[in-house]
Amino acid sequence: MPRIMIKGGVWRNTEDEILKAAVMKYGKNQWSRIASLLHRKSAKQCKARWYEWLDPSIKKTEWSREEEEKLLHLAKLMPTQWRTIAPIIGRTAAQCLEHYEFLLDKAAQRDNEEETTDDPRKLKPGEIDPNPETKPARPDPIDMDEDELEMLSEARARLANTQGKKAKRKAREKQLEEARRLAALQKRRELRAAGIEIQKKRKKKRGVDYNAEIPFEKKPALGFYDTSEENYQTLDADFRKLRQQDLDGELRSEKEGRDRKKDKQHLKRKKESDLPSAILQTSGVSEFTKKRSKLVLPAPQISDAELQEVVKVGQASEIARQTAEESGITNSASSTLLSEYNVTNNSIALRTPRTPASQDRILQEAQNLMALTNVDTPLKGGLNTPLHESDFSGVTPQRQVVQTPNTVLSTPFRTPSHGSEGLTPRSGTTPKPVINSTPGRTPLRDKLNINPEDGMADYSDPSYVKQMERESREHLRLGLLGLPAPKNDFEIVLPENAEKELEEREIDDTYIEDAADVDARKQAIRDAERVKEMKRMHKAVQKDLPRPSEVNETILRPLNVEPPLTDLQKSEELIKKEMITMLHYDLLHHPYEPSGNKKGKTVGFGTNNAEHIAYLEHNPYEKFSKEELKKAQDVLVQEMEVVKQGMSHGELSSEAYNQVWEECYSQVLYLPGQSRYTRANLASKKDRIESLEKRLEINRGHMTTEAKRAAKMEKKMKILLGGYQSRAMGLMKQLNDLWDQIEQAYLELRTFEELKKHEDSAIPRRLECLKEDVQRQQEREKELQHRYADLLLEKETLKAKF
């Protein structure tokens, strides 16, 4: 009898590796081909193994408390729908079902008071795992069976074969074609060398014959060209860098060896300098050192300034009360206004409200699900199954947020209202004489009625509320009438220790300033210094205006010329010299960085620093104070006014200024090839074309930037106004529909009106016709009646005869 092979069983490590490699090669659709590599597994088992265990997206970590609560909640809402529950939790369906049964068994053990540390779902000796695809793989034995070795070698050979029969045949045909072409080429060359010319028969190819033609060939125009600018650099080949090890690069083994050597040297130096830390590092003790976690404190609910204000108010009221007692004022109004609120109940201040006891929600939900699973049929009757408090408000369970009670913000002498009992039971309180009310505290002194007793008030009754308002108004009126006459004999006296406190605050050095405040103050000082330094710079640097990359020193005139320079020319030369010095200084200390340079590198600057330094050594740059710069600016303003009055210059309008600016700007031309500006009348046609191309490119860049900005703004406005647009379109559609309905109704109205006119004119004619028909019918009926009577009489006569 042949041996029957039943596929399945525990998965081994070898089978897992073969399955992963096969999925990488064949994909996740050809499970039959993948299963042909594994002799003991079917295609369905391979697919289940991949989607239940080997898929890298499967989460195999410990279940968190939130996931367990969500699992039990969803199992309560959607029983047995594990394929629907699994993606919500982020686990597989088998994991959800297994952990759900684990929680139920754990709850059952707790109900039976059988606390065991073992997993209740663990297989017992002799049991067979019904779902081996969801369990870890069994390690491979050292001496594997021949069947497993044969399966492994076959899978290795099949998976290593990345080229099938068709690919090998194509490669062989391509190689034969290349050999045939080379042989024909050699034959034609030999015949041509022997003086025999053979015309090659070309087959018409659809594409380009790259063996006979030059693709994208552009033949130069006929004529002579100047080749003086075509300077070719001679190839200086360095044959020492053409060795095999230089071409291959550094080997990985050499790099690892060098790194190991560096680590040994570093460890040796560390042992020589810091022996204890090196011993800890080598012994591995440092792995067990636990880093202390950061202390997280809640934000203060009352600031220091508010506490100081409270203290000041308390001191002022205490001083006023003591002054009133010393002066002998004992009337009821003053005693009420100056009531003492300092003494607090220490037992209340020392009591900490307790937080509500937390409950094991997971255990409660598991017990509820077990109870619902084991419910008898409702046909038997009886009481419902007792359940814990459950939640059906949403897909995810509600989380109970535990908050620390705030004892700071409560009023010290607050009389508890109805239902305002705290979490901790209070001692020394008298219960209220109200039925079904929470016992409240004994009311403390409250002469100003700040905290009225509202435990017995029924604010839902409007008549009661109006009665309370009338009583409070009357009580206030009587109190105001009973006030004594005012006396303007008050004087303001500062406390004796106020000045001492101010001095102690100034002298107190024990206060440690916060590091963030220190950094902020230092940053503010640095910003102020930077602003000051910026104000001392030149206007071109302050406004980040374009500055020349090279200084043109040829603008200076020679001093020994004939005829000699005039005083005005000498002054102009001094101004030019100072300008050149300023340019050298700015190029050295504040090089210009164009805004279009996104990499943050200076283009064309920094290479002539030695030249700038040498010039500044011979012509030192002189720094001026703020006052000197202000005086120079005033002198320039005065000179401008003198020139303006002397040359009769008036106020230019914006149109005239723009016209002059456009005329001046049109005379200047930028040469991108030479990176400089020149006059437009001195430039050649080629330079003008290049300048216009550069300007066109810049304008296109601006246009692209503005288009992106406009698209971004359009997208933003679409997000902001999309609802309004859709609403407007809907209203327009409704308006059009209503207009169509109005037109249709108007047409129907006109139609029925015309129909009514025709009916009104046709009704009399119809009535006449009907009347005539009725009259004819009546006459016909009379004639027939007479004939009937005659025939009846004739019948009777004939009967009488016979």
From Swiss-Prot:
InterPro entries in alphabetical order: CDC5L/Cef1, Cdc5p/Cef1_C, Homeodomain-like_sf, Myb_dom, SANT/Myb, SANT_CDC5L_II
Keywords assigned: Activator, Cell cycle, Coiled coil, Cytoplasm, DNA damage, DNA repair, DNA-binding, Isopeptide bond, mRNA processing, mRNA splicing, Nucleus, Phosphoprotein, Repeat, RNA-binding, Spliceosome, Transcription, Transcription regulation, Ubl conjugation
Pfam families xref list: Myb_Cef, Myb_DNA-bind_6
Region called Interaction with DAPK3, residue ranges: 501-659
GO biological process: DNA damage checkpoint signaling; DNA repair; mRNA splicing, via spliceosome; regulation of transcription by RNA polymerase II
Domain HTH myb-type, residue spans: 1-56, 57-108
The keyword Phosphoprotein appears for this protein: yes
Basic and acidic residues: bias regions: 118-127, 246-262
Maturation and modification: Phosphorylated on serine and threonine residues. Phosphorylation on Thr-411 and Thr-438 is required for CDC5L-mediated mRNA splicing. Has no effect on subcellular location nor on homodimerization. Phosphorylated in vitro by CDK2. Phosphorylation enhances interaction with PPP1R8.
Residues bearing the modification Phosphoserine: S303, S358, S417, S437
Assembly and interaction partners: Homodimer. Interacts with DAPK3. Component of the precatalytic, catalytic and postcatalytic spliceosome complexes. Part of a spliceosomal 'core' complex consisting of CDC5L, PLRG1, SPF27, CCAP1, CCAP3 and CCAP6. Interacts with PLRG1, Lodestar/TTF2, and NIPP1/PPP1R8. Component of the minor spliceosome, which splices U12-type introns. Within this complex, interacts with SCNM1. Component of the PRP19-CDC5L splicing complex composed of a core complex comprising a homotetramer of PRPF19, CDC5L, PLRG1 and BCAS2, and at least three less stably associated proteins CTNNBL1, CWC15 and HSPA8.
Name of the molecule in the record: Cell division cycle 5-like protein
